[in-house]
């Protein structure tokens, strides 16, 4: 866990400082059943702990997906432009 707090985990998209740890980790522990509690209900009701922070995270994820789609479209457009090679005279250039 020290590596995650120091930011050495390059695979995580969202930094841990973005979250209020108490509001995020406790519902996750309740959901996964790792938190030792007397209630044996396994229902995972995270809607009660939703805050504006959670909603903004969902919006950011959707925006990232749209940006990725836009990037793939740009790459395809560039590929189409490159399909027409410039006509070469066949003279000069390479000497073997």
From Swiss-Prot:
Acidic residues: bias regions: 52-71
Positions of region (Disordered): 32-96
GO BP: cellular response to hypoxia; defense response; innate immune response
Bias type Low complexity, positions: 35-49
Positions of disulphide bridges: none
Origin superkingdom: Eukaryota
InterPro entries (UniProt xref): PEP
Propeptide part(s) removed at maturation, as residue ranges: 1-73
Keywords for the protein's UniProt record, in alphabetical order: Plant defense
Family that this chain belongs to: Belongs to the brassicaceae elicitor peptide family.
Described function: Elicitor of plant defense.
Name the UniProt record assigns to this protein: Elicitor peptide 3
Organism: Arabidopsis thaliana (Mouse-ear cress)
Biological classification of the source: Eukaryota, Viridiplantae, Streptophyta, Embryophyta, Tracheophyta
């Amino acid at each position: 866990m020290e590596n995650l707090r120091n930011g050495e985990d390059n695979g995580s998209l969202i930094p841990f400082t973005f979250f209020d740890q108490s509001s995020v980790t406790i519902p996750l522990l309740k959901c996964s059943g790792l938190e030792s509690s007397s209630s044996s209900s396994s229902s995972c009701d995270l809607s009660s702990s939703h805050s504006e922070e959670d909603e903004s995270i969902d919006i950011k994820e959707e925006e990232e997906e749209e940006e990725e789609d836009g990037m793939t479209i740009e790459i395809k457009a560039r590929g189409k432009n490159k399909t027409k090679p410039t006509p070469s005279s066949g003279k000069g250039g390479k000497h073997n």
